[in-house]
Amino acid sequence: MFCRSPFLGISSWSLASAALCPSSCSFPAGRDLRCDAAVPEVKWTAFVRTLVARPLSADDVRDFVSTFAHCRLALSWPVGAELRFATSDMLGITQAELAKLSRGYGCCPGMDLTVIGVTIFAEVSALVLVGECGEIYAFNGVFDDALYRLAEDAFGLWKHGLRRFEPVYGSKCLMETGASFFGGMSGVDDALAFAVSFDKALVPLPWPRGAFFEFAVPRRAEKRWRLIPGGGVAVVIGRFFGRGVTLPLLRRQRVLMDQVGRVYAASLDGGAVVRLSDSFRAFLAMGVRKLFKNHRFPPGHLWTMQLPVTCVHAPVINLPAVYQLSPHMVEREMSAVSCGASTVVRRDCEDTLRDGDAGVDTS
């Protein structure tokens, strides 16, 4: 899709080191620059002070990046990760390519994106951009064809680091989950055999606290399979268990795995299928946060089909706490449009809204 700029599809660390090293530098292209004490480091106070200004000026952001070009900003997680500052010109990225990236992957068509550099951890690297509201994104079309929102602002990046960037969990250097033995799948039958081999086993999740994932394949064959967004079939491999699973939303969810090992959640009531992670290892490292908030935006605005909708440019949409679809034909619909995504409130829910019992629907 983006053939001119390697950083819209970064394929290796050597590309990153070559692009981020000053022209006068004599470092070889494959050298790991993160270990070089000679690379100047930027303080978080300077970075945050620039990005918290309101209104945020793209010119101010570009001036900051130009001033600290080739310098690094140490990230809080994972240990050893860093942001290396670089302008779009240094990386060979044109404004036309940025506009194409915004149109194809942004939560809202036409949102402004400003390149600030590249984030690096082991063999995983990604282009880092700042949005018009100060939100921070990462993109690498080679690892995952999606735009990730790393944080809502500079404070969020300081706090979370790369925790929201799913490709980092596939790094060979990241083994905090203790789940290195969970590899990729070569088909749904392989995923089914994987789940059966661990039947009734409990694996702790980082969030919510006290929650576990329990391997549990339904006994009835017709309940084992679900269609997933974009085509394909996934097999039910388990459910959530433990004192942390107190929300009705979690109790009614089943965990699915597709033919390549991606993990999903789906309600027993037949609701939306929500993609949780690219791998089982990433699922164990992230927990079920993506059931409540989505930070991954696939191309073509397909993220509108991956609930919940999370857009920083519009207020939260309040829906009834209990959202039940009528079995009969819907005679009237009330449509609330936000950022191009339509949220439909059924007629049988309007009384609940009118009585003031509306809550936030996270399903």
UniProtKB/Swiss-Prot annotation:
<keyword id="KW-0732">Signal</keyword>
<dbReference type="InterPro" id="IPR003360">
    <property type="entry name" value="US22-like"/>
</dbReference>
<dbReference type="Pfam" id="PF02393">
    <property type="entry name" value="US22"/>
</dbReference>
<feature type="signal peptide">
    <location>
        <begin position="1"/>
        <end position="18"/>
    </location>
</feature>
<protein>
    <recommendedName>
        <fullName>Protein U2</fullName>
    </recommendedName>
</protein>
